[in-house]
Amino acid sequence: RAHITNQRTMEVLRDLGIEEESHRYATPWEHMGDSLFTTSLAGEELLRIRAWGTGDERKGDYIQGSPCGLMDLPQPLIEPIIFKNAAERGATFACNTEYLSHVQDADGVTVMLQDRLTGREYAVRAKYLYGADGARSKVLDDAGLKVEGQLARAGTAYVIFKADLSRY
């Protein structure tokens, strides 16, 4: 699950009034830093790179880019803060719920959902539909929206494998 909270997200948390509360549960930006590549948890270090703008080379870019820094706050810790704040503003939530489809009209949107625990399908009427369903967004596809531009400059893939390399 997600854990690095970028500067744009921090700006949103500030706008929502929950930046300070979020910091209480996070690893602060100044304690973030190196990404290590090792043969095991205590094994040989293969590579160390500065990350998240904490090195001298990039920190200024990050500081100029936003009034907010980054933090490392795992999704299971930030979600309750966001849910509590939204509930205090009148929002309701349905966990273990899958988006199925939606129909938009001039007054809002009707969203079809399925309770993943019971299998029950039901409709919810809303003013807005916000899709936070990831890179292969069904909401985005169903709305007929296209993502333009290039992917980020770099991608990350973590691979763990075991192999007998003793003959080498």
For the regions a protein language model found, what residue spans apply to each?
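General small-molecule cofactor/ligand-binding pocket signal
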Residues: 92-94, 148
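Flavin (primarily FAD) binding-site architecture
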Residues: 131-145
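Core beta-strand elements of the Rossmann-like FAD/NAD(P) dinucleotide-binding domain
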Residues: 117-128, 132
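Active-site-adjacent segment of FAD-dependent monooxygenases/related oxidoreductases
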Residues: 1-89, 103
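Flavin-dependent oxidoreductases
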Residues: 160-168
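A conserved short coil-to-beta-strand element within the FAD-binding core of flavoproteins
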Residues: 95-110, 114-116
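Short acidic, glycine-rich loop/turn motifs
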Residues: 39-42, 113-118
